């Protein structure tokens, strides 16, 4: 058996190539030098003398053995096995010497944490080493587990965002990354890892720094998308349920559904479906917000179609109870036929119109929409026109509404815009509440003067009760209080004047001072407060006027008028003598 085959049996291919290369490159290496470092028992091999004819052959064999041993020992001591790519680095005339140098370098202690940049030839040997490959394999496994966890966390979010795939590609992982087809920023590329010049610790720190920086940037985006989708889905579900419960006709359902979807998508409005005659469940009404009940349950005069929502939790304020501008004639029936009532789904919210000799609650629609109830009525947007306050400079009563006037009025919207408060609701209310004024008119002044016959010191709450058609604010309330202050001032001036006149006439007994209807004092007061003389002054006012005159007479006769505050006791007496105001003054149309 050939000894070369025995020596080359552990690594037959690589070692044979390297042995042949070293045999061709080094013919002059000395065997005794190699024998000192050789671990193999070369002494057991029989040696030949130079005089032996086979000496040259034995010397050749020993040299080859020494070189092969050196190469094998260098391969065992090197960190990475030789590969065909860097085999040329080991094939050189100085192969044994470099192997010994590598052996000495391996014995030196080197720090494990910080790896100094090695020469180019050493990097080529270290990249493919078993330790580096093992660490790369572990790193890939960790990244693969992390990727699986992220994919498992992202799958429920993708399914929750709906079958439309709204969240696909927007979460932490895109569709390509989820399927493994696209580029993955956290997967280490083998070619890139082999070609880089960084050490292993730097690569691990870089990978660990990339993991937490990627997740927070994608998580808020996916949460925001999920939140928006859930909000939209809940809004659509609530709208559909309200429409099915509160609305019967399919035509109005389609119309209101479109308006609800358009306004809920903007996120600035709130749906408030009409509850006129279509609501059959009282529990659904109790669950509605208060502003919806106020809009839907405002009674309009004595009309039978204006159905009240009797809810003890949400009482309607008295100032929100309007009165019609003028009572309809006696020959006008206050009920509508059944076929009209069937088409009046939005009667409470969309106002009233005069149609076919009846006061009905149907919204203003053209003839085609009335013939086809399922078709969508041509509703004009309510923001295009704004109802102007009915401030009439020379008239005592607002003009009666006609059918043409009603057609030009805006309709109440299906939703109430938030952050506008009561002012926006008053502006949008239809026919029945369009009398609510932003300011005061001469009709209000006339009513206030007539109310002075009954009360001289009215409170703000009393004014709100008897002026239901006025939108009260701080300015209007102070203006009305100022009116009554002027009324009292004129009243007390006339009383003081008459008392001094009686003293100058020689009257000594205050009981003789009585205000009669034919007296000069009464004529002056009646001309000021009842200019048209179309109101009968009550007898209680004559009694209060007589008492006031007597009090002024006593104060002036006693000389108390020298005190700057001598009138205050008289004011206290008169303020306690207010009488009840008739109920007719609560009507917004009184006086005509």
Swiss-Prot record:
Gene that encodes the chain: PROX2
Bridged cysteine pairs (disulfide): none
Start and end residues of each Prospero domain: 496-592
Protein name in the entry: Prospero homeobox protein 2
Function: Transcription regulator. Does not seem to be essential for embryonic development and postnatal survival.
Pfam family, one: HPD
Biased composition, class Pro residues, residue ranges: 314-331
Biased composition (Low complexity): 360-377
GO cellular component, one term: nucleus
């Amino acid at each position: 058996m050939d000894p070369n085959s025995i020596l080359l049996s552990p690594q037959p291919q690589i070692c044979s190539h390297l042995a042949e290369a070293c045999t061709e490159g080094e013919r002059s290496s000395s065997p005794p030098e190699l024998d000192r470092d050789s671990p193999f028992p070369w002494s057991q091999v029989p040696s030949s003398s130079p005089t032996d004819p086979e000496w040259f052959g034995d010397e050749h064999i020993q040299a080859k053995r020494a070189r092969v041993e050196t190469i094998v020992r260098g391969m065992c001591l090197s960190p990475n096995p030789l590969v065909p790519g860097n085999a040329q680095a080991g094939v050189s005339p100085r192969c044994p010497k470099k192997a010994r140098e590598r052996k000495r370098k391996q014995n030196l202690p080197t720090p494990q944490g910080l790896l100094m940049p090695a020469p180019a030839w050493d990097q080529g040997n270290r990249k493919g080493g078993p330790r580096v490959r093992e660490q790369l394999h572990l790193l890939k496994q960790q990244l693969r587990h992390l990727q699986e966890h992220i994919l498992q966390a992202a799958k429920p979010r993708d399914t929750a965002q709906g079958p439309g795939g709204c969240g696909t590609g927007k979460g932490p992982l895109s569709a390509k990354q989820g399927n493994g087809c696209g580029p993955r920023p956290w997967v280490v590329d083998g070619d890139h890892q082999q070609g880089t010049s960084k050490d292993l610790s730097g690569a691990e720190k870089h990978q660990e720094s990339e993991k937490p920086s990627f997740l927070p940037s994608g998580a808020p985006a996916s949460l925001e998308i999920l939140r928006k989708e859930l909000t939209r889905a809940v809004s659509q579900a609530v709208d559909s349920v309200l429409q099915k419960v509160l609305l019967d006709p399919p035509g109005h359902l389609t119309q209101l559904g479109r308006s609800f979807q358009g306004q809920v998508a903007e996120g600035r409005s709130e749906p408030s479906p009409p509850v006129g005659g279509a609501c059959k469940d009282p529990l659904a009404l109790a669950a509605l917000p208060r502003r919806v009940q106020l809009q839907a349950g405002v009674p309009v005069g004595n009309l039978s179609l204006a159905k009240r929502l009797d809810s003890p939790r949400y009482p309607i304020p008295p100032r929100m109870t309007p009165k019609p501008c003028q009572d309809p004639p006696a020959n006008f029936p206050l009920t509508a036929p059944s076929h009209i009532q069937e088409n009046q789904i939005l009667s409470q919210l969309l106002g009233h119109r005069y149609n076919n000799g009846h006061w009905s609650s149907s919204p203003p629609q053209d003839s085609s929409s009335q013939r086809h109830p399922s078709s969508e009525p041509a509703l004009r947007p309510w923001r295009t026109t704004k109802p102007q306050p009915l401030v009439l400079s020379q008239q005592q009563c607002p003009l009666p509404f006609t059918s043409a006037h009603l057609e030009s009025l805006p309709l109440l919207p299906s939703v109430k815009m938030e952050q506008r408060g009561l002012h926006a609701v008053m502006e949008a209310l239809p026919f029945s509440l369009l009398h609510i004024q932003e300011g005061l008119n001469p009709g209000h002044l006339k009513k206030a003067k007539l109310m002075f016959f009954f009360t001289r010191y009215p409170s703000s709450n009393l004014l709100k009760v008897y002026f239901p058609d006025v939108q009260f604010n701080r300015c209007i309330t102070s203006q009305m209080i100022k009116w009554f202050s002027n009324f009292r001032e004129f009243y007390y001036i006339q009383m003081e004047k008459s008392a001094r006149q009686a003293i100058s006439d020689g009257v000594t007994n205050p009981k003789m001072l009585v205000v009669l209807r034919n007296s000069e004092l009464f004529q002056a007061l009646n001309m000021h407060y009842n200019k048209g003389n179309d109101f009968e002054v009550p007898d209680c006012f004559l009694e209060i006027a007589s008492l006031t005159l007597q009090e002024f007479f006593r104060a002036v006769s006693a000389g108390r008028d020298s005190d700057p505050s001598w009138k205050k006791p008289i004011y206290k007496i008169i303020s306690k003598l207010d009488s009840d105001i008739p109920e007719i003054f609560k009507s917004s149309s009184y006086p005509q």
